[in-house]
Regions:
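Carbohydrate-associated surface elements
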Residues: 153, 173
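Short hydrophobic beta-strand element within catalytic cores of glycosyltransferases
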Residues: 299-303
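Conserved donor-binding/catalytic core segment of Leloir-type glycosyltransferases
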Residues: 2, 148, 189-207, 213-216, ...
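Membrane-proximal helix-turn-helix segments that form the acceptor-binding/catalytic region
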Residues: 104, 130-146
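Aromatic "clamp/platform" in nucleotide-sugar-dependent glycosyltransferases that forms part
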Residues: 282
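Glycosyltransferase donor-sugar binding loop
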Residues: 39-44, 174, 200, 228-244, ...
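A short, well-ordered alpha-helix in the C-terminal region of glycosyltransferases
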Residues: 341-356, 368
């Protein structure tokens, strides 16, 4: 079975999709399928292509970068003799290329909205998305043989958007971290013995980091004096400047530190040295950063909008709200826990990843959906008709 993976970027420019699509393609390959990856090149592609090895990856120069348009993309897909196509993300030229491939070959594709049909995401730059939906995206969604949701909440969002296709509910995955290795955060070593509360991801308003900093302000000095809030990520639309100004206004130049974007070994080291992860998001699909923290046996503070209720159910995460006072309550709970209790929360997260979010398990689930689409037979357990 030849599976194509189509994504607008194969580099860190794709954000969380860089990890999730790469992991899924490798997992599907391990589950007795061959994978070919197609994407648009960008400034980081040459650096990050090595992370896709041993997969076959083809990138193409864009003529219209903002939309991800390349006139070489669709012909390359048509020449690849794929059995099925896996398309990731919305609102870009990839959606048009996917439909063109489908019409020309008569072969099916699975559409992965990647959380982009959540209500908050649809409202963000809403008029542009409504125009794209009318022009091509709704047709692209309706024509998919199956839509993949990362969680039950996303499946409900897809139905609320009006799609009636079959939906497979299959989460993202991660690999378990090697806890025997001593982490070394080379570029951002902390010189003192304070505990580290890590945020890792895009610096974007939907991540709700301004309210996190306001919550840090509400936390008494006696609680946060032994901690540092480390914010790691890449700026979007100037949000980093707003956050840094807020920390200066509060006098937090020491207890709140901005690490910049972390990838590869630096990112792994950040998970290794931190004592907990926080994700106060207003909207998510299924955040891979939480899974990565659990894979490193770290406790997590997160909102219910992160769509990982399993973490709350097994005691691997502390639930926080999105308002500053609600986040502050979670910070107080975390800080007042003993080291042993925090470790126990992280250990439960690692066990959860091993049992539900491992890539081998997810690769098998996805392969069963491919086989069902191509050959019929028994409906996989993950599919909602």
């Amino acid at each position: 079975m030849k599976v194509g993976f189509l994504v607008s970027s194969v580099s860190r420019e794709a954000g969380g999709l860089f990890e999730s699509v790469r992991g899924l393609a490798k997992a599907v390959t391990c589950a007795s399928a061959s994978a070919r990856v197609f994407g648009i090149s960008d400034e980081q592609s040459a650096v990050d292509l090595q992370d896709w090895q041993p997969l076959s990856v083809e990138t193409f120069q864009p003529q219209f970068r903002a939309w991800g348009y390349s006139n070489q993309l669709a012909p390359a897909m048509l020449g690849a003799d794929l059995d099925i196509l896996s398309t990731h993300g919305l609102w870009k030229y990839c959606s048009v290329a996917s439909q063109r491939w489908h019409r020309r070959t008569g072969r099916p594709y699975i559409m992965h909205p990647e959380g982009m049909l959540e209500s908050w995401a649809l409202r963000n730059a809403g008029w542009k998305k409504r125009f794209a939906a009318l022009l091509y995206e709704d047709r692209h969604l309706r024509s998919a043989a199956c839509l993949r949701a990362l969680c039950e909440a996303e499946a409900q969002s897809i139905r609320s958007y009006g799609m009636r296709n079959p939906i497979c509910v299959i989460p993202n995955g991660v690999d378990l971290a090697d806890l025997s290795e001593t982490p070394k955060l080379q570029a951002h070593a902390f010189a003192d013995d304070r505990k580290i509360l890590l945020y890792l991801g895009r610096l974007h308003p939907k991540k709700n980091l301004a309210n996190l900093i306001r919550a840090w302000k509400q936390t008494p000095d006696s609680h946060r004096g032994d901690w540092v809030l480390a914010i790691a990520g890449w700026d979007q639309a100037g949000y980093e400047h707003e956050l840094k100004q807020l920390t200066r206004d509060y006098g937090f130049t020491d207890s709140v530190q901005f690490l910049g974007p972390l990838f590869g070994q630096d990112k792994d080291a950040a998970y290794g040295v931190c004592h907990a992860l926080i994700l106060p998001s207003l909207s998510e699909g299924l955040p891979i950063t939480v899974l990565e923290a659990w894979a490193s046996a770290k406790p997590v503070l997160m909102t219910r909008e992160c769509n990982l209720p399993e973490g709350f159910a097994v005691g691997a995460a502390l639930q926080i709200g999105t308002a500053p006072e609600e986040i502050a309550a979670g910070l107080k709970q975390l800080i007042e826990m003993s080291d042993d209790d925090r470790r126990a929360v992280g250990d439960r997260g690692r066990t959860l990843v091993a049992t539900k979010f491992s890539w081998p398990r997810i690769g098998e689930q996805m392969r069963s959906v491919y086989e069902w689409i191509l050959g019929g037979g028994t409906t996989p357990e993950s599919v909602r008709l």
